[in-house]
Amino acid sequence: MAEYKNYTLNFGPVHPAAHGVLRLILELDGENVVRADPHVGLLHRGTEKLAEFKPYNQSIGYMDRLDYVSMMCNEHAYVMAIEKLLQLEVPERAKYIRVMFAEMTRILNHLLWVAACGIDLGAMTVFLYAFRVREDLFDCYEAVSGARMHAAYFRPGGVARDLPTQMPQYQKTRFTSKRKAKKLNEPRQGSMLDFLDHFVVDFEKSLDEIDTLLTDNRLWKQRTVDIGTVTAERAKELGFTGPMLRGSGVAWDLRKTQPYEVYHKLEFDIPIGANGDCYDRYLVRMAEMRESNKLIKQCVDWLRANPGSVLSDNHKVAPPKRNAMKNNMEELIHHFKLFSEGYCTTEGEVYVGTEHPKGEFGVYIKSDGANKPYRLKMRAPGFAHISAMDELLSGHMLADTPAIISTIDVVFGDVDR
């Protein structure tokens, strides 16, 4: 009798469902996955080592490029680690602005996730719906920083500047008619806070549309229910965090369990799943977007009623005012030295973890008292999830592989660093 051998298949790194540069070596028995061996490192750029050769305030831009779809959430952990090292006090208004943008970033991440997951599983309409909404939030990024993705808006001690009193306006182009531009600009006539008041109302309707398309869709449930199941105990043993852990029924969220910034003053719930499968992870992320929308609304209301400073008055980290630099040579010298040499910190080591859209994103800094870290280490949430790929895929069909990879929500900018 002929001997049967398992088939070895390379999945990725150039595959539309690989979500970046994931390379999986799959061992197949027919169409059943017997073993999955993930290979990482194809997007390694040496970010940690680069940051160890630059002053603290010159590495904020690197953080945006780690998980490049959750930009400000990466910045958030990094600047909080520096503040902990320097024992900096952050103005209350800056804390609310940070939380508001962190929740906007969570929505941006989850919208991209549901869009990409929809395409992977054959539901392309969701992609178009989600990207339409993402443009509104990118407008907010652009309004505060001038950049639509890599904002570098957070600073040790606060944020770069206060919220703008007007939003960017759409212009008539080859692709945007005058009538369409006028309609798009209607909610953008006031300040950013006015625009966000419109957004939180419209976003609920957009989520309802996605819910209608997917949640009770027979084909969607066939592709996700009982696929990639992980029990609560096993999820904890594997080091899962974020929606991967909460999808298995564990109510662990650093915003609640280890509150930072102003999360302890805000009201929100922690959505959890029951079965730990792909479908539960989808439901958790959809519910998280609704909770983030509530948090944005609470921040908008507080910010409207409480004007104030958005950056620490500690001159060690805060640049001088523009008017002062025009009239005072010492202020100009201080500005030059701050942005060329940076500032020295006390000796010591700190770790700060934040609730990133994909899980716990942590920054560890060891300082020897210089103006740059002696050692910078980052905890990428996706690395633990990728490490469990063999367990998640084994026993499933090859066609289930895109669904499982997609609901892990991995981006290799932070995994490979």
Curated annotation (Swiss-Prot):
Membrane topology: Peripheral membrane protein
Protein name (Swiss-Prot/TrEMBL): NADH-quinone oxidoreductase subunit D
Domain of life according to the entry: Bacteria
Gene3D superfamilies: Cytochrome-c3 Hydrogenase, chain B (1.10.645.10)
Species for this entry: Francisella tularensis subsp. holarctica (strain LVS)
Reaction(s) catalysed by this chain's protein: a quinone + NADH + 5 H(+)(in) = a quinol + NAD(+) + 4 H(+)(out)
Described function: NDH-1 shuttles electrons from NADH, via FMN and iron-sulfur (Fe-S) centers, to quinones in the respiratory chain. The immediate electron acceptor for the enzyme in this species is believed to be ubiquinone. Couples the redox reaction to proton translocation (for every two electrons transferred, four hydrogen ions are translocated across the cytoplasmic membrane), and thus conserves the redox energy in a proton gradient.
Listed EC numbers: 7.1.1.-
Quaternary organization: NDH-1 is composed of 14 different subunits. Subunits NuoB, C, D, E, F, and G constitute the peripheral sector of the complex.
EC category: translocase
GO terms assigned for molecular function: NAD binding; NADH:ubiquinone reductase (non-electrogenic) activity; quinone binding
UniProt family annotation: Belongs to the complex I 49 kDa subunit family.
Keywords: Cell inner membrane, Cell membrane, Membrane, NAD, Quinone, Translocase, Transport, Ubiquinone
Record-linked Pfam families: Complex1_49kDa
Localization in the cell: Cell inner membrane
One cellular-component annotation, GO: plasma membrane
Keyword Membrane: yes
Coiled coil: none
